[in-house]
Amino acid sequence: MARIRLVEHAAGAPGLRWFGLGPDLKPSRGLLKLRRLLHKHAFWAQQRTTADLKRMLAGSTVAVSLWRGKRMVGFGRATSDGIHRAVLWDVVVAGDLECRGLGWRVVGALLSAKAIRNAERVYLLTTNRSGFYQQMGFEPASP
């Protein structure tokens, strides 16, 4: 099995957004592969267009992707003011590779990014993965 590589994109993910860059800053049709990953493995993102993804990435403080060879197998992003609040968004791992620690790797990379780790509070929204995030120390918000 090919090794899985983590790519930490610059703020706004310009390489991924404009040039489709993947590992080693090589053109890899990354934006198309992100769209494919979201459409196949994230029911909440199936209607997102390429234009939507470009705008989403442009507004992201942090974005990371996981690659196995030329295939994007994971993704996550976050926004933050760098001091008070941060929010994790769009964390997804290819279904055939779930339960192998890849989600932990994506979330860990997001949480260790300077703009996120310096935030007083980190929030996220999840529909059906609350158990995963609770294992990482997140708690349900009180009303």
Predicted regions and their residues:
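Short alpha-helical functional segments enriched in proximate histidine and acidic residues
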Residues: 113
